[in-house]
């Protein structure tokens, strides 16, 4: 097994050679490891392009097809020829930019089941934020050209979520992204900003002072190495990383063509929770947010809604539940436990409620019928939530 120094240098090299979600690179690194894969790629780059496949394991070529590798090596060749390993090694040793790899304790556990996740992340700031309790990390995104209403909602919601101990993730752009980060900075809570280029080229430049503040109290992060230019396709790839890093994505003010919807779609594809703040039905800049809710996203109107969306069932004690005195009155202990574990807004199935309450699924199904007749729960497509709360 290669030593850690070689491994880190190879991971950094591959971040320079490839763009996000390079399927061939991910396959090669998964099969051979970053160090061996880099050696093969460098040898192949110096040979005739038609002979590149001869450097790969025969079984790998047979399973994946030779044409795939011809195209991949063609993509990598220019960057392989320009790769300066001594200069890269020197940059890593200076320590201005941290490199987080899959071997590091700070590598995000949230990436465990994410297909084609990066092999390395570049960071400035507190990298321990990457591997904290996953349910505390929430992406909050929205329009760049934010309205007065969106401005007020983003500021208030981000402030309150930060106060509840959540770490908010966003993209550092104008509008909602910037408001979310600024609310966290004012609340003196850490925030993570995912950039679409190298950390030495933060974009937009007008937010440079904010990025400096984030690097001191939170984390600046990118899957692209220093020197990388922010480009349109990298912004789209960055959105996937924002969703992957977070337990949930909350969209605040998005039109039908907003990049925030791209982040939300990535979240859905990754099996993450997605919520949206509703807006006026006659304003097109809110049409995307409203459509998300229509398509099944959780309606978000408060920090409590966000907390309930991301927390395991039965772990959130809602203020609305506490003030509704006597909602468990007249129930036997098992029924009370099952009702207490039933969520307020997002319906849950019998299996989830059974896990949260410690009851058997059969007990949940039996008792839910009685609770529904009493008007204490509502059934929606085979799932339940509390009624009248």
Locate the predicted segments by residue.
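Glycine-biased, small-residue-rich flexible motifs in mid-sequence functional cores and linkers
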Residues: 1-8, 16-19, 93-95, 99-389
